[in-house]
Curated annotation (Swiss-Prot):
Any one GO molecular function term: demethylmenaquinone methyltransferase activity
Lineage: Bacteria, Pseudomonadati, Pseudomonadota, Alphaproteobacteria, Hyphomicrobiales
Annotated EC: 2.1.1.163, 2.1.1.201
KW Transferase (keyword) present: yes
Encoding gene per record: ubiE
Biological source species: Brucella suis (strain ATCC 23445 / NCTC 10510)
Function: Methyltransferase required for the conversion of demethylmenaquinol (DMKH2) to menaquinol (MKH2) and the conversion of 2-polyprenyl-6-methoxy-1,4-benzoquinol (DDMQH2) to 2-polyprenyl-3-methyl-6-methoxy-1,4-benzoquinol (DMQH2).
Keyword ATP-binding: no
Protein name according to UniProt: Ubiquinone/menaquinone biosynthesis C-methyltransferase UbiE
């Protein structure tokens, strides 16, 4: 496992060789050279950092709060002192704060994100909530975690893994840093499985969200990318297979709101 801090590129899966000779990756539905993607995707998250709740409200019709509560309830954080969790792509603290509160403020959560703007928002919120003593903020790469193996009791990632360029590497790193008996949980937008709901959600996603995003934040492009990135993410069964391939056991998932989002679980046994 790498011990160096790197830069993660929040884009989709590797695609093909580009004209410049570098590999191409998906940026939403667009193919971009790997040398361009870092700036493109980081710019998206710099833009939305201070309006992250608005973004999630638009993407989920407000349901992300319920899904996050369910994620932490399924995790069931321990109330014993010394229990540790790593929240990846968790810059603004939504999951970490819930974990600390659910543990009776016993848990210590490390919040890792590649984007400094997102981490800055998280620090401000943590101070206001009086949770800063239970948290550590780390700017680093999900594919090259700067931690020793067998360091954490739990690993969580919510609405972040679809933006990692090499999902298999991120999953492998998750497995490495978890202690034996540790839990992996991933909440992510997924494939809608209800015939009527999928059409309604597509209409909302591709037509309404970018327009509303532009009205509220003056930025339609960032919201278009975020919608497109959801469609590029593997289906529930395919992602579960990737988790198993990384070494996790007892892999399972739960659909939320007809599959608009899915919560995946795995154990390092």
């Amino acid at each position: 496992m790498s011990q160096q801090n790197g830069n993660v590129n929040r884009v989709g899966a590797q695609d093909r060789v580009g004209a410049s000779g570098g590999m191409e990756h998906s940026f939403g539905f667009k193919a971009v050279d790997e040398n361009e993607k870092q700036g493109l995707v980081n710019d998206v998250f710099h833009k939305v950092a201070k309006r992250y709740d608005i973004m999630n409200d638009l993407m989920s019709a407000g349901m992300h709060r319920v899904w996050k509560d369910a994620m932490v309830a399924w995790l069931a954080p321990s109330k014993r002192p010394g229990w540790t969790s790593l929240d990846v792509a968790g810059g603004t603290g939504d999951i970490a704060f819930r974990i600390v509160e659910a543990s009776g403020r016993q848990a210590h959560v490390t919040i890792l994100d590649i984007n400094g703007s997102m981490l800055g928002v998280g620090r401000e919120r943590a101070i206001k909530k009086g949770l800063i003593d239970n948290l550590e903020f780390v700017e680093a790469n999900a594919e090259e975690l700067p931690f020793e193996d067998n360091s954490f009791d739990a690993y969580t990632i919510a609405f972040g893994i679809r933006n990692v360029p090499h999902i298999d590497k991120a999953l492998s790193e998750a497995y490495c840093v978890l202690k034996p008996g540790g839990r992996f949980l991933c909440l992510e937008f997924s494939e809608v499985e209800l015939p009527v709901l999928d059409k309604v959600y597509d209409e909302w996603s591709f037509r309404a969200i970018p327009r509303i995003g532009k009205m509220i934040t003056g930025d339609a492009d960032s919201y278009s990318y975020l919608v497109e990135s959801i469609r590029k993410f593997p289906k529930q069964q395919d992602f579960a297979a990737m988790i198993e391939k990384a070494g996790f056991e007892r892999v399972s998932y739960r659909n939320f709101t007809g599959g608009i989002a899915a919560l995946h679980s795995g154990w390092k046994l």
